[in-house]
């Protein structure tokens, strides 16, 4: 009320006003009801905080998400349209609960689709395919191609992972869109650029700002390198979005610790870590496939980290590709101290200052 005459705030005692409880489903004492017209959303205390379990103190409040929960609820009851995001399932995909919460908190409607047994509806705007381990058959890929080719302004975001086996059918599908996923792992050879003393864990460089504002320190750890099959081919055009450092190299799968000690880099970066392919239609609209080399970049810890901008980056990608305007991105606020997530060079610089 202090900052906007469009919002009113009222405190209600359910004990004195029991009729209010009958108007809303499962409302309890302490809940927050956000209402606009005939649309409502109820928030509980668990919606306002991230709860974690510790070995010494049991469950505790790790961070506050009150701002994102309240803002999301207001957007949900006032927005005329939600972007529909569907997670592809049925092929051993990884589950990222933190990603689901981030999307829902930023007013995306999230569902699940198994393309092996059902068609992809026209109401879906974005498909997310996170590190499947089983190769899809021709019918699944035909449904994906139909979704992207017969409907304008549709998007598929694919996330690879170093634990995946060879997926010949899926990889051939991506190559037709100009994206090749290589069967190697990115490893950083410059100790000053690695994080937590892990050569597979370093920050990436944003090589194209089309989908983002100016950002730094997006982490794409445990990544597979990508390759542009072509820059332009008929109605398809590809763009590198993220890349490794120039000192990064690639290492074969399955190498032992002993072999790693004697391993010598033969090729250096930068290597593409994210590639966008756009298919243009005659009316100027397009559909898109974007591939990312790391499913780990969607992990709960990186999306909620204050040291990296992974959540900001992926929200910006989704907002831009779906033409969402006048949106705000809100992440959880950690209560108390937090690790800085510095690379080795930054640690030495601070330590010598």
Where are these predicted regions, by residue range?
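Short, surface-exposed patches at the edges or C-terminal ends of soluble domains, predominantly
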Residues: 1-353
């Amino acid at each position: 009320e202090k900052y906007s005459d469009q919002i009113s705030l009222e405190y209600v005692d359910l004990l004195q006003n029991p009729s209010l409880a009958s108007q809303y489903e499962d409302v309890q004492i302490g809940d927050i009801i956000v209402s606009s017209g005939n649309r409502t959303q109820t928030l509980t205390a668990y919606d306002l905080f991230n709860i974690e379990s510790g070995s010494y103190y049991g469950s505790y409040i790790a961070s506050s998400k009150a701002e994102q929960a309240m803002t999301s609820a207001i957007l949900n009851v006032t927005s005329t349209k939600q972007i529909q995001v569907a997670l592809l399932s049925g092929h051993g995909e990884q589950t990222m609960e933190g990603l689901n919460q981030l999307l829902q908190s930023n007013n995306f409607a999230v569902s699940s689709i198994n393309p092996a047994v059902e068609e992809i509806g026209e109401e879906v705007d974005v498909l997310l395919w996170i590190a499947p381990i089983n190769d899809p058959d021709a019918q699944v890929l035909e449904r994906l191609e139909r979704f992207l080719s017969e409907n304008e302004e549709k998007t598929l975001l694919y996330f690879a992972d170093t634990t995946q086996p060879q997926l010949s059918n899926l990889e051939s599908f991506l190559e037709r869109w100009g994206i090749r996923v290589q069967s190697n792992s990115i490893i950083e050879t410059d100790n000053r650029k690695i994080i937590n003393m892990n050569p597979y864990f370093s920050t990436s460089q944003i090589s194209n700002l089309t989908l983002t504002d100016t950002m730094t320190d997006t982490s794409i750890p445990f990544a597979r390198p990508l390759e542009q099959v072509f820059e332009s081919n008929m109605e398809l055009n590809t763009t590198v979005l993220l890349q490794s450092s120039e000192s990064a190299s690639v290492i074969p799968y399955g190498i032992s610790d002993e072999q790693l000690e004697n391993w010598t880099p033969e090729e250096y970066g930068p290597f593409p870590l994210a590639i966008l392919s756009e298919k243009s239609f005659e009316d100027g609209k397009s559909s898109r496939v974007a591939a990312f080399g790391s499913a780990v970049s969607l992990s709960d810890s990186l999306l909620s980290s204050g040291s990296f901008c992974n959540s900001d980056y992926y929200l910006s990608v989704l907002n831009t590709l779906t033409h969402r305007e006048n949106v705000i991105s809100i992440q959880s606020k950690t209560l108390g101290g937090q690790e800085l997530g510095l690379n080795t060079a930054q640690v030495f610089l601070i330590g010598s200052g």
